[in-house]
Structures are given as C-alpha cells and as structure tokens.
Amino acid sequence: MANIKSAKKRAVQSEKRRQHNASRRSMMRTFVKKVYAAIAAGDKEAAQNAFSAMQPIVDRQASKGLIHKNKAARHKSNLTAQINAMQ
C-alpha cells in the first residue's frame, strides 16, 4: 500500500477509474451480444435495430479511449457483414 499522500490519492483515483471503465466496457459488450443473439436467432430486423443501438455506444467508447478505434471498426464491420448476409 502507498505511504505517500499523493500516491494514496492516485490509488483511489485509479480504482475509481477502473470501476467506471469496467461498467462502461460491460455495457458495451452487452449491446454487442444483443446483436449477435439477434443474428443467431435469424431475426434480421431485430439484428438491425440492435446494431443501430450498439453503433453509437461502441463509437463513443472508442472516442473516449476505452477501446481502440480499430476494434470498434472491426466490431461494426463484422456485424454489418453478418446482418447483410442474412436472408
């Protein structure tokens, strides 16, 4: 454990940020999973609606640095291709 006052403060701030980021990351993953679930169910309209809800969330997390922008692009590209391939 830190002994210096500033190090203690940084440890508290770091833990607070970790919890905040974990919450945001979990929320983002839930939105992505909803799209995958709709694709697996074969419901194209539900998949498109879930994708529309997921896209700004993923973009926002990428812009804030929670995930890399290429990861956000990869999620969107893969899911778009899967939705378009549906009947």
From Swiss-Prot:
The keyword rRNA-binding applies. InterPro entries: Ribosomal_bS20, Ribosomal_bS20_sf. GO terms for cellular component: cytosol; small ribosomal subunit. It holds the Pfam family Ribosomal_S20p. Keywords: Ribonucleoprotein, Ribosomal protein, RNA-binding, rRNA-binding. Residues 1-27 are annotated as: Disordered. It comes from the Bacteria. Belongs to the bacterial ribosomal protein bS20 family. Binds directly to 16S ribosomal RNA. This is Small ribosomal subunit protein bS20. The lineage of its organism: Bacteria, Pseudomonadati, Pseudomonadota, Gammaproteobacteria, Enterobacterales.
